[in-house]
Amino acid sequence: MTQLVSVITPVHAPSVEYLAGAYDSLVKQDMPDGWDWQWLVQEDGQTGTLAQVLPDDPRISIGGGRPGGPGVARTLALSRVTGDLVKVLDADDQLTAGALARDIVAFDAHPEIGWTTSRVLDLMPDGSTVGWDKDPADGTIGRGAVLAFWQANGYRAQVHPATLCIRRDLLLALGGWMALPASEDTGLLLAASAVSEGYFTREYGLLYRKWPGQVTSQAAHREPVEYEGRMKIIEARAQALATMLPNGLSLTPAA
């Protein structure tokens, strides 16, 4: 029986034009024997646009719902997940060659981990790429390490939430993505790290597109009152999980 990685992509109108690139990066993934992917593309709205722009591929599942932001869209897509592993892929980003296979290998080699992340290259408007100099070493990341780094470095984690691959059972136990207008992916990463070990792959796993229309480039994303509120609730949730579950969560390894 084929095992699946369920790739979830939330879509808002300005990012539709980049879906072809995201799909192309999925098609080019060289999967391990016995594995395939499904792509759950979730519109943050109900315009029906996705059916007009996505190819006819049985691995694609299209959904929509009332507008609620990326966290709501991601969590609604979770209802259609059939894989034991859930991978994040934003509509304007692209996976690098072998990214999914490396996630799978990490889970197989380390059944104790609940999630994986990888290195990121920022994809600039002119086509150039820019890396980051604070990537951790290749290997496992202890419970709580992401939160500690995030707190000590101005609310910036040492691993990128846009590269997250997480066990479905753990994702469900944490309630999916946080009900926030933004930073919901960071909230999930810190919550997962609070209750389980993770793994970091130093090979580049994602091209993270920088462009004027992306949500994180908007002025509202850094509006002080909302920003501080988001950071406080993300921090409080992770700390509460760590306190209430000092031994972490018992994980169900992917079959």
Task: Give the role of each language-model region.
Residues 14-29:
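Short, well-formed alpha-helical segments that are part of the catalytic scaffolds
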Residues 23, 34-46, 61-66, 91:
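Short beta-strand/loop segment that forms part of the nucleotide-sugar
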Residues 64-81:
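Glycine-rich, basic loop-to-helix element that forms the pyrophosphate-binding segment
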Residues 86:
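Short aromatic/hydrophobic "clamp" motif used to bind/position activated sugar donors
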Residues 100-132:
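Conserved donor NDP-sugar-binding/catalytic core segment of glycosyltransferases
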Residues 143-146, 204, 208-211, 217-248:
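Catalytic core of nucleotide-sugar-dependent glycosyltransferases
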Residues 144-165:
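A recurrent flexible, glycine/aromatic-enriched loop bordering the glycosyltransferase active site
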Residues 181-188:
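Acidic donor-binding loop at a coil-to-helix junction in glycosyltransferase catalytic cores
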